[in-house]
Amino acid sequence: KRLLQTVLSLDIRTKICRLLLEDFINEDEKSLSKSLYMSKEQIKEMISNGMHFGSHGKSHFWFSSLNKIEQEKEITSLIKFLNSLYNKDYLLTMCYPYGDYNECTLELLTKHEFKLGLTTVPKTYNSGDSILEVPRWDTNDYYPKK
């Protein structure tokens, strides 16, 4: 999984994913996406009813695998998408894909005025912790694995 997500070039990853999709799912990417994901209209309806949508990156890349220019593009693209959903001010929040980020990510989120960043670090938030590195508990952290 990590090889596919971070080591291989985007070109090769895309080709492999398309082949896997064709061979094992037997459905084209557009149809599958439509059945799995919410439409823009559904998201807007949820927002109008008080739901908050934060960001998870535009392309769900490991941020630390991207250089500063690529991270900037990823972040500005997702801000543009969120702007197309909200018709009023909203809080920019980030839930790091795979829990992965680096100092460059934090600098860019600060530059773009993100108000919150959620990590995958399993611990309780303390008032001295960075607001862009908020730890959180996963439900899997509470129950022993059998």
Which residues does each predicted region cover?
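Extended, charge-rich helix/loop segments that form flexible
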Residues: 1-49
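Generic structural signal for short, flexible, solvent-exposed coil/loop and linker residues
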Residues: 9, 27, 32, 42, ...
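C-terminal active-site subregion of NodB/CE4 polysaccharide deacetylases
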Residues: 15, 48, 65-146
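Acidic (Asp/Glu)-rich catalytic clusters
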Residues: 38-55, 110, 128-129
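A short, flexible beta-alpha/helix-coil linker loop
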Residues: 59-62
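Generic signal for short, ordered secondary-structure residues
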Residues: 25-26, 57, 87-88
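Short beta-strand segments
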Residues: 21, 54-57, 93-98
